[in-house]
Every structure is written in structure tokens, then in C-alpha cells.
């Protein structure tokens, strides 16, 4: 092994992420870089080249971070190896951004020339600064008629404190400015500084399951080298494996003889169980292990919980296996078994937000061919019990009776909303409607304001983002972080069908909204549940108190059609007999609840509740 050659190779590596607010053109810039460096041929090139998940292409967003090795011949006559990592822009997937930054020395900070700095631009920049990365400002979409690159540079300097005087102006659509950007990567982003001669130390930043090769680990090599035949150890479990293949993504897998300190690539080692590795673990040399593991990642707790059940109970084991495989590729997903009297055996799943929940459900249905029922999402509540202990409630049906606890606390967030001056009024009105508490308002420039509210997380996760976009014509952007738990006047509302509580339909609401929400829920269920041969009573209740009710009338068979019209006694007798039969049927009949009903609570927006 020629160390001098390997060190020279290492000096020509550049590892960088592309970070930005959603829709500011990260994936388009990545496409142009792949095109200009001939990493993919013109025939193979397609939009969102690095978004290889079908769902990403359907939705037009990046969900998973993706890495690719790019070879670039610079103007100084030397060849460089770029490891480009594309990252998501949506707030739900910020954990993907933090993981990708840990594998880099630099970041391209992309800002839309027509929109300027947005909420996620700020959030992602702070992540990059925390990781001590070299940040290269990039002004994108300069081809748009509404583009104002100078204003975007001013905002970067004023709001982020970065020098934007030599920011690269590009158009991801036309390719203008991309050659200058490639040169900037060479000159401004430092080479990795890992020690090639030290024992192997590599960080697992992603992984996926392959039916033929087992678990494929995506790694950043911090120190040392790794090649096929080497014995490696995963430090968290102590388990040892023999490496069968190493390589890089370019953007399709390309085998290599060796990966060295600074490389970003993949390792396979006949790891058959998805439980044996975890994102954030450190890999080392089994014969000469490193003394200390790498710091890994801060585990981000779920924000939203929902029940997930197979439509056919026989698919329970398939769902469990699918969730385990998905968790390997989605470190933020959490799940544990749960049982519902209405839905049978399933799992209580934790997600980072509603988009994350939708994505997981769609991936399970598309990639694993499962039919699923999801219950309405809920946040984590804390019930302070009479004996002083705290019970964590992630399922509304688990909230104890009112006499058993002193108070219920719910999570609060600090919400930062960037909005044009013209829309400050509607935004403040929306926040107050969602039980928000005004904190402060900062004028960023003469056009935009940063409005800060303390708000219950439960109000944010449902339709707040959609309401915000519609009340500001799409111009507002949102970022939020959990600040802690507060005691509020919350109650559990049970939904009863023919006096039987349906656990999967229970929900928690603020007392001031409880009756309206219960009324809305019962009337919505009346529309969704098909008519039966017997009467169905739908009730909303807080404890023993019924606060709303709706009735689904039964089908009625004409039992009097044979009778002569002049025989009222016989007619009354037959109708009474029918009534007694229906009463018996109602007592023993099971009401079939359609899948739509379990998500009905999501459709209860403010206008519905207020009866507008």
C-alpha cells in the first residue's frame, strides 16, 4: 500500500452537502453538476437524478439524503474527487440534513434569487455552522425575471452573518455559473484531514437492506482504510464481520479496491439481520480497534404518533418485517406493538411530522405491497398522576380517567414564521386561533418580518402549514423547535358506536374546543359509516358525559306490502315486530367502520369546527 499515493489522493477529495430551503433548487444544481462532470451520460440524465426513491420523483421533493462520487478535472490541470451529498429541505427531514453534514467538510448554501433567505435556510445554516463546515453561498435561479441576486446576498450577510460578496450566481435550470461553482468547490472547501495510517474508524450515516447482499452500509471513513477481506467490528454491538465489497455511488454502485480516510462510500459484509447495525454506529478494525467511537448522532425524538394496522390481520408479521427494514433506512422512525379492540394487532409508530408519516405509509404500501389503516395522529402528552409520577401518553385512548391525574401537559414549540409585511395580520390571526402566544416580531428588512409565537405542537402538526400557505398566498415559511411541556386544560373525547367505545377514534382536545370537535366528529362519522340493518348511535363523550350525538337510520324493509290497506291493526303489529327484531340486531350487531373514518379527525379544520 503506497501511503504517499494515498495521501495525494486524499488531498484531492472534496466532501460537501447541498443545503437549502425546500424548492430552492438543490436537486437541480446536483443534476447540472452530474451533467457537466460527465458523471452520467446525457442519455441517462433525468430530473432529480439523485432522488432515486419513486416517491421522491412523484412528489418532486427530496426525502432521503443521497451521496454520489463525481470526478472533476480542474482548471489547474489536476483531477479531484467530489463526494456530493444532496439533502432534503422540508422541516420534517432536518435529521437527514444533520446526518449528511457530519460526513462533510463543506456545504453549498443555496438561496433562491427571487425569494431570498427562508426559515429552513436559517435552520440548515446553523446546523452547518455547528459542524464547523466551510460554507459556500450560492445564489440560484438567476434566470427568473423576478430574480434579485444582490438582495439575496444582502440577506445572507445581514441574517446569517456570512460574507456573500463572492457568492456564486447560478441557474440550475440552464447551467449558467455551474463551471465557476465547481472551481469554487476546489478552492474553498478543504480536503479531509483523517489519518490514513491510523486504525480504521468509519461512521455509518445510512444503510439499506438488499435481498442478495444483506445490509449495505453507507459510511464516511474518518481514519484508516478498508478493503474486501478485512475483518471489521461494529463498536456498539461488538459483532465482527468480514468485508465482502467496498465501493462508491456514481450514482449507481461502483466497486473499488479500497476506501481511505476521507472517502464516502459503501461497505457490505454479509450482515443479514437489520437489527445488527444502527445509523450513527462506528466501524473499526477488528484486529486493531480504535480506542474511542465517533460521536455519532443525536437521536431526534418523534413529534407525532399514530397507530398502524394491516387491513388483513394475517399481514401482521409482514408489516413488522417491513417496518424493521424501513427503520434501517429511516433512523427517525420508531415503532412498538399495540393492540386495538377495533383494529386488532398493529404498531404504535413515532414520526417527525405529518409529511414523514405520509411518506412512511406510502413507502410501506408501494415498496412492500401492504394495505394499511392509519389512525389519526397525536402528540406525546404527559399526565401528572395523583401520586406525583408522570405517565407519557402517545395514544389518546391510554389517557386515564380524570380522577386519576392532577394535570395533563402538552408539548409547546417556538414557531418562527418569515412573512412579507402585507401578510402579518392574517398570520397573527391564524396563530391566535391555534392557541398561540405572541413572543416578538423582528423586521428583517423593509419587506419581511420574522414573527415568533409559542404554540402547542398539536396545533402545528395538523393543517397549520397548509393554512399558513393559503393565508399568505404561499409566501410564508415556517421553522419550529420544541421548548418544553406546559399544563393546559385538555380532555379526552371518546367516540362510542351503539354505546361501545372505539379506542382507535379517541382523541384529546382543549376543553374550549371539545364540544365543537366532538360534534364535528360525530357528524363526519355519520357521513362515512354506511347504513346498517339496525340503527347506529354515534356519541362523543368526556367520561360519562355525552357531549354530541348523531344517528344513522337503518335500512327499512316494507313488511306491510301484502296487507290490505284497510287493516291498520295488522299493519301496526307487523311494524312492531320489525322494530323488536331491529332492537335485537342492534344489541348484537357489529358496526363496520370504514378506513376513512379513522382519519376523519384530520379533516376537522377550524372552519368546520366553528360551523362556518
From Swiss-Prot:
PANTHER family: TRANSLATION FACTOR GUF1 HOMOLOG, CHLOROPLASTIC, TRANSLATION FACTOR GUF1-RELATED. Residues 11-193 form the tr-type G domain. GO terms for molecular function: GTP binding; GTPase activity; ribosome binding; translation elongation factor activity. Its EC number is 3.6.5.n1. Keywords: Cell membrane, GTP-binding, Hydrolase, Membrane, Nucleotide-binding, Protein biosynthesis. It catalyses: GTP + H2O = GDP + phosphate + H(+). It is an enzyme of class 3 (hydrolase). Belongs to the TRAFAC class translation factor GTPase superfamily. Classic translation factor GTPase family. LepA subfamily. Required for accurate and efficient protein synthesis under certain stress conditions. May act as a fidelity factor of the translation reaction, by catalyzing a one-codon backward translocation of tRNAs on improperly translocated ribosomes. Back-translocation proceeds from a post-translocation (POST) complex to a pre-translocation (PRE) complex, thus giving elongation factor G a second chance to translocate the tRNAs correctly. Binds to ribosomes in a GTP-dependent manner. The keyword Membrane applies. This is Elongation factor 4. GO terms for biological process: positive regulation of translation. It is a peripheral membrane protein. It is found in: Cell membrane.
